[in-house]
């Protein structure tokens, strides 16, 4: 794999020894698809992974795949899964292009929710309010309240400024009882159930507000918001959103996760994983060292923390990364990619009498490396592709 010095592995700038993450990686060889959209853990500890082509259940050892079977009404309604949610009763809900379903583990089957109209519904998000009600946002069909006992969805028409024709990508209830709704193409809507009033925060006050991608509250009660281009925190006293500074020219944020320890992660599409600093004033990159994927530039569509505080990162077009909370005893060394841009996989390893590591690296040649991981010299340079022809 390109630029991997698999001594233990390549990472960044100049054969530097760094502590590695204890990680696992799964791609399309194990998953139904590497286009990951959503992640959730059920009451039995299984990790569910939604993709653009099928649903996966992971028991810690192997994956079970779920697809749509037109001849089986209890199968997945459509192979494109967009949202997963575990409710307070331990029921797993699955939303996607084929509508809304919930999983019945005793039967290993899915039950489909019926909506008022017979045509299919594209479900974009699922959330459960503190009252126990389950709301789903759809693409072009409005917002629905779900009744599991009757297996039906009822369109909500009593929320001001909510249109049955709009696209709703995110719904979140904060600790103050306000319900925040991301309206694609419009902005952010805040609904107060106690007064039945709404307020719209348009694209004029939210950069990238035409796409609301994520919402969360941290342990201090700060309401955090991500859009298609940046991230904000809500100044409740002044009823305004303040942009969180970063050093990127463009930041396509996709979701927010507040970990059990209080770390505030921001997943981005092509800019890797960021962390919102404690003072809410700055975003910094979260450095994750992996031998098989460059997380710093990954297109992260989904991020999730399981019961054991392991971090699951869904990298679009690449696969699933699991970062354990337990560190590994191994270390990685990296090759300076600017000086050695053609460095590939390790082809040979040898330790000489002086304690130096002599390593053959495909595409560059033979390096002599100290026990501290510093390159002392290039013993042999590989001929260029032109010279080899």
Locate the predicted segments by residue.
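Carboxylate-rich, polar loop motifs that coordinate divalent cations or form catalytic acidic clusters
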Residues: 1-389
């Amino acid at each position: 794999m390109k630029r991997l010095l698999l001594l233990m592995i390549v990472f960044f700038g100049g054969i530097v020894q760094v502590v590695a993450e204890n990680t696992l990686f799964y791609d399309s060889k194990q998953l139904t698809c590497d286009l990951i959209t959503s992640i959730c853990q059920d009451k039995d500890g299984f990790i569910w992974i939604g993709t653009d082509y099928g649903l996966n259940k992971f028991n810690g050892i192997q994956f079970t795949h779920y697809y749509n079977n037109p001849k089986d009404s209890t199968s997945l309604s459509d192979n494109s899964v967009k949202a997963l949610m575990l409710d307070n009763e331990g029921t797993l809900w699955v939303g996607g292009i084929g509508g809304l379903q919930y999983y019945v583990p005793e039967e290993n089957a899915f039950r489909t929710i019926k909506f008022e109209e017979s045509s299919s519904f594209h479900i974009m998000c699922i959330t459960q309010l503190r009252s126990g009600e389950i709301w789903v946002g759809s693409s072009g069909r409005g917002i629905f309240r779900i009744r599991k006992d009757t297996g039906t969805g009822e369109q909500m028409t009593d929320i001001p400024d909510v249109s049955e024709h709009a696209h709703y990508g995110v719904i979140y209830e904060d600790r103050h009882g306000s319900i925040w709704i991301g309206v694609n193409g419009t902005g952010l809507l805040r609904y107060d159930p106690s007064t039945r009033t709404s307020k719209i925060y348009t694209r004029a006050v939210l950069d990238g507000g035409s796409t609301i991608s994520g919402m969360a509250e941290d342990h201090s009660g700060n309401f955090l918001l991500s859009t298609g281009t940046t991230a904000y925190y809500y100044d409740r006293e002044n009823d305004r959103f303040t942009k969180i500074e970063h050093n990127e020219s463009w930041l396509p944020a996709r979701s927010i996760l507040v970990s059990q320890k209080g770390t505030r992660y921001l997943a981005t599409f092509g800019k890797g994983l960021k962390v919102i600093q404690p003072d809410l004033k700055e975003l910094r990159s979260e450095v994750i060292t992996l031998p098989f994927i460059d997380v710093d530039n990954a297109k992260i569509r989904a991020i999730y923390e399981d019961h054991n505080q392991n971090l699951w990162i869904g990298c679009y077009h690449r696969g699933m990364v699991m970062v354990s909370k337990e560190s590994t005893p191994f270390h990685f060394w990296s090759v300076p990619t600017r000086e050695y841009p053609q460095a590939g996989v390790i082809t040979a390893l040898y330790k000489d009498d002086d304690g130096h590591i002599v390593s053959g690296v495909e595409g560059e040649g033979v390096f002599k490396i100290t026990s501290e991981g510093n390159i002392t010299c290039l013993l042999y340079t590989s001929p260029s592709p032109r010279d080899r022809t």
